[in-house]
Amino acid sequence: MAGKGFGFSLGKMKELADAFKKAQQVQEGAKQVQEDLNNMEIEGQAQGGLVKVWVSGNQEPLRAEIAPEALNEGAEVLSELVAAAMKDAYQKSTAAMKEKMEALTAGLGIPGL
C-alpha cells in the first residue's frame, strides 16, 4: 500500500486540473454572455412595422412603438399586433441566447452542451 497516496496519478491530477480550468472558462464566459445579452436590443415587429417592441437579449421588455395608423385598428386588433410583435422579439432573443451559449460551449469538449 505504501506509495499509493490518495490514488491519484499525475495523469488524473492533470485531468482534474483541466476540468477545473474548463469550469472556470465556462463561468467567465457565462458572465460575459450575460452582459452581452443584457446590452442587446432585439426588435420584434408586426404588420410590417405598425407595432414594434424591443427586448434585451435576456427578454426583458425595453420599449414599444405603435404607429398612429395602428391606433385606428381598434383595441382587439391592436392587442393582437402587440402580441405578435412581442412573440417575434421573443423568438429572436431566444435564438440570440442559444447562439451565444453555443459559442460559449463550443470546443470545450463538455458532453451534452
Curated annotation (Swiss-Prot):
| Signal peptide limits | none
Q: Which InterPro entries match?
A: YbaB-like_sf, YbaB/EbfC
| DNA-binding is among the record's keywords | yes
Say which species the protein is native to. Answer: Synechococcus elongatus (strain ATCC 33912 / PCC 7942 / FACHB-805) (Anacystis nidulans R2)
User: One Pfam family name from the record?
Assistant: YbaB_DNA_bd
Q: What is this protein called?
A: Nucleoid-associated protein Synpcc7942_0464
Q: Name one GO cellular component term.
A: cytosol
- What is the similarity comment for this entry? Belongs to the YbaB/EbfC family.
**Transmembrane segment boundaries:** none
